[in-house]
Amino acid sequence: MAEDSTPVSATGEPSLRAPVTAADVLEWLEQAAEAARSGELDAPALIDLLGQLRQASTACANASDWALLAAREAGASLRQIAPVFGKGYVRAPAARLEKLHREVLSSEQFLELMRRRMGNR
């Protein structure tokens, strides 16, 4: 019997997961590469995919910024956050927070900013 690997919160409830994972992207990339090799995807289709991926990348970066703000608001220290930035020191998340705080002061303000930007498209 396979174990359920769904993350749980401190209360024991299932934890919210990111909408896409690195494994999901790799699986998709393998399929896309095979389609490109076999000629199923021509240059215009690949350019369209490139545009979609760049938009998705921006959306993921925005979600990451929101999560950073929300984690700090929930009491996480920069030392706790630093490892997810791939660094053992706090400069990376601190610099990102400093940049974000030039535009917004909270995760809720950030979410509202994203809503406004999406409405302007």
Task: Locate the predicted segments by residue.
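Short, flexible helical or helix-coil boundary motifs
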Residues: 33-36, 40, 57, 104, ...
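Residues within the helices of the helix-turn-helix
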Residues: 79
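Short, Lys/Arg-enriched anionic-surface-contact patches
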Residues: 43-64
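General nucleic-acid-binding
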Residues: 1-44
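Short, Lys/Arg-rich amphipathic alpha-helical interaction segments
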Residues: 83-84, 88-121
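Short amphipathic helical patch at the helix-1/turn junction of helix-turn-helix
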Residues: 71-73
